[in-house]
């Protein structure tokens, strides 16, 4: 499924502008090797900060992926807010993934917590507790609490939060991003099961990763 439109995130324009302008300056001076280097950097910045439109699935009892990437873990872990054991789906984003994060369900943001930390490889187990991260608690229309955690990685050094406590998010709505390779953990509430498989490539705002358990 191809997006109808592919824009650029607001965070990307300074980097794109700087590298693009530098390429033009070096080209005007006849310094072609440097111009080529900055042209490549400009292209990479445009690719990294791309923000394609996505068609979000409709239907009751569905949760869509909060991030582009590969599912590297589906396991029970302690929720960052309640401490209770809940099923967690971990999605690893490499530097070539779209890094805009989207809400898995419609709901209201109840809590946001930032944790300073290290920058080890986001694919490692200890990244969930040791790395810099930002956790969000979201209550859906049925009163169920969802938790999403943005985890900075080995290269990623900035987590971007675009929402506040009390904000109402739609399913698939953008709520933030992480720069240059990272991970998002999605904690499911009771009554939901994983609808994606380990190793599966998923796309934020588009792929269903969990659904309500059939009674």
Swiss-Prot record:
Keyword annotations from UniProtKB, A to Z: Cell membrane, Decarboxylase, Lipid biosynthesis, Lipid metabolism, Lyase, Membrane, Phospholipid biosynthesis, Phospholipid metabolism, Pyruvate, Zymogen
Subcellular localization(s) per the UniProt record: Cell membrane
EC annotation from Swiss-Prot or TrEMBL: 4.1.1.65
Pfam families, per database record: PS_Dcarbxylase
GO molecular function: phosphatidylserine decarboxylase activity
Catalytic reaction(s) noted: a 1,2-diacyl-sn-glycero-3-phospho-L-serine + H(+) = a 1,2-diacyl-sn-glycero-3-phosphoethanolamine + CO2
Annotated site residues (Cleavage (non-hydrolytic)) in this chain: 181-182
Residue stretches spanning the membrane: none
Disulfide bonds: none
Cell wall biogenesis/degradation is among the record's keywords: no
Manner of cofactor binding, per the entry note: Binds 1 pyruvoyl group covalently per subunit.
NCBIfam families cross-referenced by the UniProt entry: PRK05305.1-2, PRK05305.2-5
Role summary: Catalyzes the formation of phosphatidylethanolamine (PtdEtn) from phosphatidylserine (PtdSer).
Assigned protein family: Belongs to the phosphatidylserine decarboxylase family. PSD-A subfamily.
Protein name: Phosphatidylserine decarboxylase proenzyme
Originating species: Desulfovibrio desulfuricans (strain ATCC 27774 / DSM 6949 / MB)
Gene: psd
């Amino acid at each position: 499924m191809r997006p109808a439109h592919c824009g650029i995130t607001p965070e990307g324009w300074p980097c794109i502008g700087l590298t693009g302008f530098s390429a033009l300056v070096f080209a005007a001076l006849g310094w072609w090797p440097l111009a080529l280097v900055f042209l490549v950097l400009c292209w990479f910045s445009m690719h990294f900060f791309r923000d394609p439109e996505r068609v979000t699935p409709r239907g009751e009892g569905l949760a869509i992926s909060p991030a582009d990437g590969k599912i590297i873990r589906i396991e029970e872990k302690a929720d960052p807010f309640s401490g209770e054991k809940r099923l967690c789906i971990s999605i690893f984003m490499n530097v070539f993934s779209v890094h805009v994060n989207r809400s898995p369900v419609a709901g209201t943001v109840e809590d946001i917590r930032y944790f300073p930390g290290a920058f080890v490889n986001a694919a490692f187990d200890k990244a969930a507790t040791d790395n810099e991260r930002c956790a969000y608690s979201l209550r859906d229309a049925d009163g169920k609490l969802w938790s999403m955690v943005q985890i900075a990685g080995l290269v990623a050094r900035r987590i971007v939060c675009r929402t506040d406590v009390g904000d109402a998010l739609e399913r698939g709505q953008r709520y933030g991003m992480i720069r240059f390779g990272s991970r998002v953990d999605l904690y499911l509430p009771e009554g939901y099961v994983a609808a994606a498989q380990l190793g599966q490539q998923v796309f934020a705002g588009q792929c269903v990763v969990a659904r309500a358990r059939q009674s």
